[in-house]
Amino acid sequence: ADQQAVFDYCVANISKKPSKFADDTVIGSQFNQPLLEFSGSCAGCAETSYARLITQLFGEKMYISNATGCSSIWGGTASISPYTVNKDSGHGPAWCNSLFEDNAEHGLGLYLGQKTVRENLIKRIAEIAGSDKASAELKAAFDEFMATKNNTKANDAPAKALIAELEKAAAAGCTESAEILKSKEFIAKKSVWIFGGDGWAYDIGFGGLDHVLASGEDVNVMVFDTEMYSNTGGQASKASNIGEVCQFAAAGKEISKKSLSEIAMTYGYIYVAQIALGANMNQAVKAIAEAEAYPGPSLIIGYAPCELHGVKGGMTNCQNEMKKAVEAGYWNLFTFNPANKAQGKNPFTLTSKAVDGEKYQALLANETRYSRLTRAFPERAKQLFARNEQVANDRYEHLSRLVELYK
């Protein structure tokens, strides 16, 4: 009871601490209010860790289109919403979900809709600012707004200043300013996110995802990669790995995991990142911030250990399991930022180390989704696990060559 009182006081009274540290750092992001809370996901769920972090970075300006799956269940169970508003501004993520597997297209529609409204508003404001009757303050506010128009973070304060000047103009009798203010929530730059799991991104929604990424529009895709269809009970997906035991692969999956990240990289103009929050928080925060700032499509794939993996010790070890996966070479951390080319920098950054065979096999043995194959078919398990490790070695060598090729 005493702890509940302390918790209630903190929720009601502890405010965010802006400007103490940069938002795009681990420590700075954690001074911002999470706009995802009390989600009802499985205890230790990795997906909510990623979503929570993104809301701390961009939550007040976020539009979220969510694929149907685990993230739509903990993200929007009927009658409640774990997404909340900032208690200072009253703003928070606008969340929606399409039941049909067209989430990428749905998210693109959200982006294009608000983009069209915003561009029309900017055109109308430009006409007001360019007239002889416009005040010097309104002209200056509009110039500053236009200078930051395409930067979500930098555009926030200029947008508020511009709205304040439009309100003054409306109060002075400008009817056009008054009309524009009816849609003032569209003036500031928004951050549009498309959330979904690997079943959606790698499999049944891949066609739409590919279409949206290829469009070149400024949308951000966050894939929670659990390496299986988690929400429906653990079926194999194209993200499942060799030797993994799950539904439709009861004797262990025989083919290797699809490399969604590298497929996206072939376009050359898509920001791509693979992250694992528990393994390298700095890399994860930096990648998310860079992806959002990139003026084009971005794809972030986050490793997300699931309750169905059967991690020894339970999901209290979720974040540590991410660290083990990266240290073993099971999961690679990297970013591909096309914007670096214009600055003479290498667009591809590989943060991971090579495969450690001993740690790799220990990781597989630490998860029931693999160890159950050893109990049922020991010889088959030995063969498939060796292939799993070899594919990981080949993939790391390939990624290492990409570092040199992109120089």
What name fits each language-model region?
Residues S39-S79, G196-H211:
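Conserved phosphate/anionic-ligand binding catalytic regions in large, soluble enzymes, centered on
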Residues F100-E176:
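N-terminal leader/propeptide and maturation segments of large enzyme subunits in energy/redox metabolism
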Residues V26-G40, N97-L112, T116-K133, F186-A188, ...:
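Conserved thiamine diphosphate
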Residues Q4-A5, I14, W74-G75, T84, ...:
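Thiamine diphosphate
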Residues A1-I14, T68, S72-F100, H309, ...:
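Terminal amphipathic helices with adjacent charged low-complexity linkers/tails
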Residues T48, L53, L57, K61, ...:
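Generic, well-ordered alpha-helical scaffold segments in large soluble proteins
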Residues S79-P93, A284-R380, R387, S400-R401:
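Glycine/aspartate-rich loop-and-adjacent alpha/beta segment that forms the canonical ThDP
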Residues A1-Q56, Y63, I80, P93, ...:
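Flanking helices and flexible, charged tails adjoining ferredoxin-like Fe-S electron-transfer domains
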